[in-house]
A protein has these predicted regions:
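N-terminal secretory signal peptides that target proteins for export/translocation
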Residues: 1-20
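Generic N-terminal simple sequence motifs
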Residues: 3-6, 33-36, 441
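Boundary at the C-terminal end of the N-terminal hydrophobic targeting segment
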Residues: 32-40, 424
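Coiled-coil-like amphipathic alpha-helices with heptad-repeat character
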Residues: 6-7, 41, 446, 459
Length: 558
């Protein structure tokens, strides 16, 4: 049986995320001569997970520059932003309607690059300049028109590269007549060309677009609200084109294939899976990540599938309004018996776990920062949907969020340790069942149980002379594989912050393992154990810190 290593003591951790109390464990341990090698300092092997903001309050480069300090206070790693240049007459020119036959000049957008270079980014590391497939009135066989479209894409990549931003954000959705860019049925010239002819031409145009893009920015990231995920219903067919011919985005897979034909290894593409707006379960995010990674390869030419697997990321969109809209709205996320803000936290967490790197947060009716858009309410999202900002902060980085909340509570004098004998300073303590437990000479500290494998001859004891901040520690000497244990009642959905301070001696190693039992004291949810290592520093006393969410069916945290 795996070692039931202890989570350590608890403090009440009140936050806007949920009504249940969350818990904070904290303890001091001294481990000596455990038979496990100490590990050298290493690089951070975690996959980066990032939240990108977008919506009706989207900033242009000027507002981004003017409001960056305020914007970076929000729980995001970057934004999709608009580029608005000025033509020779001084009139504004939007970069976003890129699929038009209008000729633009680079110098019209030099102000956007100047804005971005003058913006003092500290937190927003991943920012993307937005373009879209509108007005979409350039026929795929219009060579002159597509020269303009290709040049618009080139300008977007140029702006991104010259400003030091991450790349281009592409919205394929048609918002203006003729709503035609990727729909074969909407093509004005479909009477002259078959679907297969349009499909081949769309791939050629994709090649031209991406060749221009990577000439400007070889290491670009092209982040789409959706890619082949929008056509998942066409998979599972011998020839997906039989389905795509009727799809509103039936030509999009060919356009993407063209991208892949010419993309260098350093280019990255992100399928944002806008379909996720309705998702309300971990299963949906995992299933659609598999769809994007596996099934959607059927929409990619065989010669491009290895490149697709290597360079196309799975991402998800989270629609904030769905957690704010009334139940009568078709865009409504149910709380499933709890608060809708709690569902926002859970769903955003699931989205980040299933995504390769990015999740985009989209809002319409409320705002995160100043906007001139009259269709957006004056209220911020934290005002309109209390707890929403904390929900996103927790999902993005539970440890950072927990540390901040604990610091707030400590400053307010309301941080209470719920662990029993957490500082190892007492020889008497009330147990989990309410029965007093007295320390026994030569034994572990009062209130703590111990375990070690049968062939280990180590000693667990109470050391009254050492401690991280005061005298008192639990000591394990020559324990080959064992742990201190404490059990507490827990409820599904609770959030537990776990902290220990450890001193290692000799060739010892230690970690905290959080395990789960049913209310009947049976082990459960083994796959959701949480293991927290000791931080790699040169300090004498080193910290273990992490967060564990109580899974369904759990009644006790161990």
């Amino acid at each position: 049986m795996p070692t039931p290593c202890t989570p350590l003591p608890l403090r009440r951790f009140l936050c806007a995320l949920q009504t249940q109390a969350s818990l904070f464990w904290c303890a001091w341990l001294c481990v000596a001569a455990v038979a496990a090698p100490a590990l050298p300092n290493s690089v951070d092997m975690r996959l980066p997970k990032k939240l990108i903001a977008t919506g009706w309050d989207k900033a242009d480069t000027q507002r981004l520059r003017e409001n960056i300090k305020l914007m970076e206070q929000r729980p995001f790693d970057g934004v999709f932003f608009s580029a608005v240049g000025k033509n020779d007459a001084g009139a504004p020119v939007q970069l976003r309607p890129a699929h038009s036959n209008q000729a633009w000049k680079r110098e019209w957008f030099q102000n956007c690059i100047a804005d971005l270079k003058a913006t003092k980014f500290t937190r927003f590391t991943d920012n993307f300049v937005s373009i879209g497939a509108n007005p979409g009135d350039v026929d795929w066989f219009d060579d002159d028109g597509w020269k303009a479209v290709v040049d618009h894409w080139r300008m977007a990549a140029w702006i991104a590269k010259q400003s030091g931003t991450q790349g281009v954000h592409f919205d394929p959705e048609p918002y203006t007549k003729p709503y035609a860019q990727f729909s074969y049925q909407a093509q004005a010239e479909k009477g002259k060309h078959t679907f297969n002819e349009y499909y081949a031409k769309a791939r050629e145009r994709g090649q031209q677009v991406m060749q221009a893009v990577v000439e400007e920015y070889p290491g670009i990231t092209v982040y789409c609200y959706f890619m082949n995920s929008v056509n998942i219903s066409a998979t599972g067919q011998k020839d997906p084109r039989q389905i795509l011919v009727q799809s509103g985005y039936g030509l999009f897979p060919a356009f993407i294939d063209g991208w892949l034909d010419v993309a260098p290894p350093g280019a990255t593409f992100v399928d944002g899976c806008e379909t996720a707006y309705h998702f309300n379960s971990e299963r949906e995010y995992i299933l659609h990540a598999l769809h994007m990674k596996i099934a959607c390869q059927e929409l990619v030419a065989p010669e491009n599938r290895a490149k697709y697997r290597a360079q196309v990321q799975a991402s998800f969109g989270v629609y904030l309004d769905a957690y704010w809209n009334p139940p009568t709205s078709p865009w409504h996320i149910d709380g499933l018996g709890g608060s809708r803000v709690e569902r926002l936290r859970i769903n955003t967490t699931s989205a980040l776990q299933a995504a390769d790197e990015y999740v985009w947060i989209y809002g319409e009716k409320n705002r995160w920062w100043p906007t001139p858009n009259g269709g957006v309410n004056k209220e911020t999202w934290p005002e309109a949907l209390p707890g929403s900002e904390d929900a996103l902060r927790f999902a993005r980085d539970p440890v950072e969020f927990a540390r901040a909340k604990i610091a707030e509570m400590k400053k307010a004098g309301i941080l209470i340790n719920l662990a029993r004998n957490a500082d190892f300073g007492s020889d008497k303590v009330e147990g989990n069942t309410g029965v007093q437990q007295d320390w026994k000479e030569g034994g572990a500290p009062a209130g703590w149980n111990v375990w070690q494998v049968s062939d280990s001859q180590g000693v667990f004891s109470w050391d009254r002379e050492v401690g991280a901040s005061a005298k008192g520690a639990a000591r394990a000497s020559k324990v080959v594989n064992g742990c201190f244990i404490q059990v507490a009642d827990a409820k599904p959905g609770e959030l537990h912050a776990v902290r220990a301070v450890v001193r290692l001696q000799g060739e010892s190693a230690a970690w905290v393992r959080v395990r789960w039992q049913t209310p009947e004291n049976k082990w459960t949810q083994v796959g959701q154990d949480v293991i927290l290592p000791v931080e790699q520093t040169d300090d004498e006393w080193r910290e273990v810190f992490g967060v564990a969410a109580v899974p369904e069916g759990v009644g006790k945290i161990v």
